[in-house]
UniProtKB/Swiss-Prot annotation:
GO terms for biological process: base-excision repair. It comes from Bacillus cytotoxicus (strain DSM 22905 / CIP 110041 / 391-98 / NVH 391-98). Keywords: DNA damage, DNA repair, Hydrolase. Gene3D superfamilies: Methylpurine-DNA glycosylase (MPG). This is Putative 3-methyladenine DNA glycosylase.
Length: 204
């Protein structure tokens, strides 16, 4: 079952925590690639100095953040790595959740080929398959083509995981400062990164 529109509404920190354990799904050439979300970061513009929308900054890139919740915000870092975010909060409030890491679930063969061009991986390579925002986008083939997509469609969406299979039964959810935002002054210290402690696929 897809996460319905109300799932993405409400406080962004709550949505971030709710996303943990759900599946991020991308259908590529008819094949379902998916992973359990094990690490996220919340970004709460316009007051959050780490957010692209800090100060209400509206550009062609950030305009999606001001739109309806439950849409995909994809952008490039270092000109080569894609990052996938889920838009949250009501229209006009530019907030979102960065998906930082996944535990591979379906379409693992295709993910291996997308990341490494081969099927036989070392333990370290497998652990690195989706343990970072750029890595998971490469594995799931999420690019700027998916930017702005509604997560109610049949191509890219969040799939709710039954309680009996949910990773929260195996791992404790913990929080801490976000990663690689040294420029964000006091926002550097906000404990808005949430992850499953000791899950082998978290980014660090």
């Amino acid at each position: 079952m897809k996460a319905p529109p109300p799932f993405y509404e409400g406080d962004t920190l709550d949505v971030a925590k709710k996303l943990l354990g759900q599946k991020l799904v991308h259908i590529v050439d008819g094949v379902k690639r998916s992973g359990y979300i094990v690490e996220v970061e919340a970004y709460k513009g316009p007051d959050d100095k780490a957010a692209h929308s800090y100060g209400g900054r509206r550009t062609e890139r950030t305009e999606i953040m001001f739109g309806a919740p439950g849409h995909a915000y994809v952008y490039l870092i270092y000109g080569m790595y894609h990052c996938f975010n889920v838009i949250t909060a009501p229209v006009g409030i530019p907030q979102g959740v960065l998906i930082r890491a996944l535990e591979p679930a379906e379409g693992v063969k295709e993910m291996k080929l997308a990341r490494y061009g081969k099927m036989e991986l070392t333990k370290t390579q497998y652990k690195n398959l989706t343990n970072g925002p750029g890595k998971l986008c490469r594995a799931l083939n999420i690019t700027l083509e998916e930017r702005g997509l509604s997560l109610q469609g049949d191509k890219l969406y969040i799939e709710l995981v039954p309680e009996s299979q949910h990773l929260s039964s195996q791992y404790e959810i913990v929080k801490g400062p976000r990663i690689n935002i040294d420029y964000a002054e006091e926002a550097v210290h906000y404990p808005w990164r949430f992850y499953f402690q000791n899950n082998p696929f978290i980014s660090k």
